[in-house]
A protein has these predicted regions:
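Bacterial N-terminal signal peptides that target proteins for export
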Residues: 1-7
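Bacterial N-terminal signal peptides
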Residues: 9-16
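Sec/Tat signal peptide C-region and signal peptidase I cleavage site
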Residues: 17-22
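Subset of outer-membrane beta-barrel
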Residues: 23-317
Length: 317
């Protein structure tokens, strides 16, 4: 089996476990949402209350805590033609240096599949275990009057049958207003826009290069305290992948959340994706002081996609 063939099969196996399968995007580690709360709400990342680095770094200014840390895992259903379980795992931390500044660091890993190798005659050779990881940094600055800007950068290492390294960047801005009223009830509004996964192609050698899945994302979230112990929230966001040019993709997701006593939450939503990559989403969460526990399940609506679950734990100090 030649190198190019191995790379193509490895990409297909990785993609078979992710939403990006039909679109030729073999770097789903840069685009898959690792935050369980927003995953349950149609992957509307503007509603992030954790995993700020990978969703909306500016949202850290909505909390009165100085330090935040999160860990999450997304596990996908078994991919056809591969052994093992594909998963994406993430760690992130953020720290507010002052009233207007915050910095972030994180790490992501995607892998878990094993592919059977063979030579040109079909004889078995060694197994191949593709994986990707990223080392990530971020910074956000509060401009004032609810506005903030942010930027993140990622060092990428990708192993198929050959290795490739590269970099990706994200720039965005957000607006928050926590002094709103809706029907005489206190409300909080968050708006977010960004361009992500910007960077040069990854070069695996032998003329095989992979274009990063660059996208534009816009979203918003609104929460309302309808009573002393009852809060409802809604979120909506869209993403348009315009790179690679031959694999353009539009996704739109939204969801609702009900929270009792600022402690227990239930969530549901729907994510539309071109080319039968849609999901029904659902989940629940628990919060106690600074501790956050969340879980989500994303159920595919067609064979082209993949069902998966996400669990996350976080703490704000």
């Amino acid at each position: 089996m030649n190198t190019k063939h191995i790379i193509l099969i490895a990409c297909a196996a990785l993609l078979g476990a992710t939403q990006a399968n039909a679109q030729g995007q073999d770097l789903s580690i840069l685009t898959t949402n690792t935050d369980a709360r927003t995953a349950a709400m149609g992957n509307a990342s503007a509603a992030a209350e954790g995993m700020y680095l990978y969703n909306n770094p500016a949202a850290i200014f909505s909390t009165d805590k100085k330090f935040t840390a999160d860990a999450a895992a997304s596990l996908f259903e078994k991919a056809e033609g591969a052994d093992g379980t594909f998963g994406i795992y993430a760690l992130s931390a953020g720290y507010k240096l002052a009233k207007r500044h915050a910095v972030f660091a994180g790490f992501r890993y995607a892998g878990g599949l094993s592919l059977k190798g063979s030579d040109l005659l079909g004889n078995p050779t060694k197994d191949y275990k593709p994986y990707n990881w990223t080392l990530d940094l971020g910074y956000t600055y509060f401009l004032g009057k609810g506005f903030a800007a942010y930027a993140t950068g990622s060092l990428i290492y990708s192993h198929l049958s050959k290795n490739a390294t590269g970099a990706a960047f994200c720039v965005g801005g957000a607006y928050q207003n926590n002094e709103l009223t809706l029907a005489n009830k206190p409300a909080n509004l968050m708006l977010d826009a960004k361009v992500g996964a910007i960077g040069p192609q990854l070069d695996y050698g032998n003329k095989h290069k992979t274009t990063l899945p660059t996208y534009l994302a816009v979203g918003g979230a609104l929460s309302v305290d309808v009573a002393e112990k009852h809060q409802v929230a809604a979120a909506l966001s869209s993403r348009y992948f315009f790179q690679p040019t031959e694999a353009k993709l539009f996704m739109l997701g939204g969801g609702l959340e009900y929270t009792y006593n600022k402690m227990v939450s239930v969530r549901a939503g729907y994510e539309y994706g071109d080319h039968d990559l849609s999901h029904v989403t659902m989940g629940a969460g628990f919060k106690y002081h600074g501790l956050r526990l969340n879980g989500a399940y994303n159920l595919k609506t067609a064979d082209a996609g993949s069902s998966y679950c996400t669990i996350g734990i976080g703490y704000d100090f």
